[in-house]
């Protein structure tokens, strides 16, 4: 009888510990690129691998070519591997960029192609990180093009936006459909200012949140979503859960899922 009581007590204790934390959502940074069959951030296979995990979202970077085409690519210099040619996305034509392979042999995707794939598994949102451009005019062009492509694909309710440059954030707030999720991706503005910008979320590096932990409660009081990136270490994932972070963006979504389940029960 005593053994049964202790077993029940142990189960109750585990449940109590798990129940005290709210489960954060998980976003795969650049897709699940560490999956054996993907291996490249922003590749189509990385998006597919993230969708198979049934997590909240898969992040990808969107950039504007010299001739105004929106491509899914991480930065100015395409990460094609040392043996492959490099090109500045913003100073190159779409044709040139689309001919450069990723290190895993895949090629860059257009935003249209990514949205087609996202539509097949709408439970996993596509998180679009609009990259800063050389001029404000190009940033406005990028915002306009992205919003038009998303609208044409009928994916407004399945897409969220990240903006590292304030101008991109202001343009998104002004032009995106009402109710769109728009995060300021930076580290310099406090929650009050970000709320004033019209954004719905702060997407800051884990180091910023640890340094300014009071911003988490402040953001929540203002109705803002708190997102931390790039959270890869087990201790950092646990810290985010313990401190009420709403979204964890990570290169290690499988590890994050495991820890969320352990500390919070089944992810919502």
Spans of features found by a protein language model:
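Bacterial Sec-dependent N-terminal signal peptides
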Residues: 1-22
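Phosphate-group recognition and catalysis centered on beta-loop-alpha active-site segments
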Residues: 19-268
């Amino acid at each position: 009888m005593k053994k049964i009581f202790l077993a029940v007590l142990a189960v109750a204790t585990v449940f109590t510990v798990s129940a005290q934390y709210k489960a954060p959502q998980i976003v795969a940074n650049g897709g699940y690129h560490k999956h054996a069959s993907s291996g490249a951030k922003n590749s189509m296979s990385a998006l597919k691998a993230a969708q198979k995990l049934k997590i909240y979202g898969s992040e990808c970077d969107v950039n504007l070519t010299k001739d105004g085409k929106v491509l899914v690519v991480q930065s100015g210099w395409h990460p094609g591997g040392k043996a492959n040619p490099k090109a500045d996305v913003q100073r190159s034509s779409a044709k040139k960029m689309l001919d450069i392979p990723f290190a895993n042999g895949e090629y860059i995707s257009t935003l249209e192609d990514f949205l087609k794939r996202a539509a097949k598994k709408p439970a996993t949102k596509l998180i679009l990180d609009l990259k800063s451009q050389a001029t404000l005019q190009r940033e406005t062009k990028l915002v306009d093009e992205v919003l038009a492509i998303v609208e044409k694909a009928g994916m407004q309710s399945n897409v969220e936006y990240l903006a590292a440059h304030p101008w991109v954030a202001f343009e998104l707030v002004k032009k995106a459909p009402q109710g769109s999720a728009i995060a300021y991706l930076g580290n310099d503005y406090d929650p009050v200012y970000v709320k004033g910008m019209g954004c719905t979320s702060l997407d800051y590096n884990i180091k910023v949140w640890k340094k300014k932990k009071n911003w988490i409660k402040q953001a929540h009081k203002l109705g803002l979503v708190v997102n931390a990136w790039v959270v890869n270490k087990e201790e950092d994932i646990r810290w985010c859960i313990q401190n009420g972070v709403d979204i964890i963006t990570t290169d290690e979504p499988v590890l994050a899922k495991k820890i969320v389940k352990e500390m919070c029960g089944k992810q919502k």
